[in-house]
A protein has these predicted regions:
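Extreme N-terminal starter segment of soluble prokaryotic enzymes
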Residues: 2-9
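Hydrophobic positions in the central parallel beta-sheet of the AAA+
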Residues: 10, 43, 145-147
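Short polar catalytic/cofactor-binding loops
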Residues: 11-17
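Cys-nucleophile CN-hydrolase/nitrilase-fold catalytic domain and related Cys-dependent amidase chemistry
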Residues: 19-20, 28-105, 112
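Short, acidic/polar
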Residues: 21-32, 152-159
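Active-site catalytic loop in hydrolytic enzyme cores
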Residues: 70, 91-161
């Protein structure tokens, strides 16, 4: 077990409904973080970094999300880092989920999590389908779990962990 893990929390200049620009900005921010000393073990991207909050119809960005996921896998493998992929609009079984992925140092997906508590005043319930299960995983011998934004307002989620 590694005693200390270094986390790079990446803030991006997200441009609404411009996935190509946002993808380039994410890659640039991650490459810049690689130059930091000490070298980060884990990179963390923000919620809906690819599209912004949330262009309509969000479904049109599902294919862009597939490409973003592939980029994250490749980046994690190429640079030997863990990558928590913020969240992306993912189409699965006829629904759209606000999903985050976790990739290990070899680029393998070790977990994913669908946001469980959608923010009604923000209109998320009209756009996304809520997730139904927690996601825990291990990083260098440390157990970790995920939540996305509004999820933090529900302590029962964290008690269940």
């Amino acid at each position: 077990m590694k005693d200390k893990l270094i986390l790079a929390i990446l803030q991006l200049p997200i441009v609404f409904a411009e996935p190509e620009r946002n993808l380039a900005a994410a890659k640039e921010a991650m490459e810049a973080a690689l130059c930091k000393s000490p070298h980060p073990d884990i990179f963390l991207l923000p919620e809906l970094w690819l599209t912004g909050f949330f262009p309509s119809p969000i479904e049109q960005y599902a294919e862009d999300a597939v490409h973003a996921k592939e980029m994250m896998q490749t980046f994690a493998k190429m640079h030997g880092i863990y990558l928590v992929g913020g969240s992306l609009p993912i189409r699965e079984k006829g629904a759209i989920y606000n999903r985050t992925f976790i990739f290990d140092r070899s680029g393998e997906e070790i977990a994913h999590y669908d946001k469980m508590h959608l923010f009604s005043p923000g209109g998320e319930k009209g756009v996304f389908t809520a997730g139904s299960s927690l996601a825990t995983f291990s990083i260098e011998g440390h157990t970790a779990a995920l939540a996305i934004c509004y999820d933090l307002r529900f302590p029962e989620l964290f008690r269940a962990l």
